[in-house]
């Protein structure tokens, strides 16, 4: 038999039961499409050393999340502190962070796509931005890992 249509997600309904707001997350292929259309900008929130070690995603703005969390006065978990301590501190100031996000979100009316290594930290960051008044913040599901898989599956044209 035909499956009943799923009710439309109500973005205002944030029941505490759901671990992550589904409307907070976006798939990588959709993210890349939005970027190509000029509707969105990807913000890589990994620490600088992670990007050096694992590689960067082209055309992303880099804002390390943990520095931002600290700047905003949010406590870091032990793991986060370890990661923060593992790399050289990235010079980030709150003003610069907000200037960047404001420019993307308000001036250019961009969807802010947050990417981390696996898609966990970016969910937190997207929620943080939403709470701070940036409704178009989304977390890229799967993060950098998903991007690498996608690259492996579809060989990119050779870079000059």
Q: At which residue positions do the language-model features occur?
A:
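Rhodanese-like catalytic fold shared by cysteine-dependent sulfurtransferases
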Residues: 3-41, 48-113, 118-160
């Amino acid at each position: 038999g035909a499956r009943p249509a799923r009710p439309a997600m109500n973005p205002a309904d944030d029941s505490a039961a759901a671990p992550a707001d589904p409307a907070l997350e976006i798939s990588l292929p959709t993210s890349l499409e939005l970027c190509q259309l000029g509707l969105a900008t990807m913000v890589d929130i990994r620490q600088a050393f992670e990007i050096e070690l694992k590689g960067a995603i082209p055309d992303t703005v880099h804002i390390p999340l943990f520095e931002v969390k600290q700047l905003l006065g949010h406590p870091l978990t032990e793991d986060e502190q370890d990661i923060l301590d593992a790399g050289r501190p990235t010079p980030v100031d709150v003003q610069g962070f907000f200037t960047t996000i404001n420019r993307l979100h308000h001036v250019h009316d961009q969807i802010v796509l947050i990417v981390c290594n696996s898609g966990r930290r970016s969910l937190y960051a997207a929620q943080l931005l939403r709470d701070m008044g940036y409704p178009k913040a989304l977390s890229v599901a799967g993060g950098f890992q998903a991007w690498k898989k996608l690259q492996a599956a579809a060989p990119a044209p050779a870079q000059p």
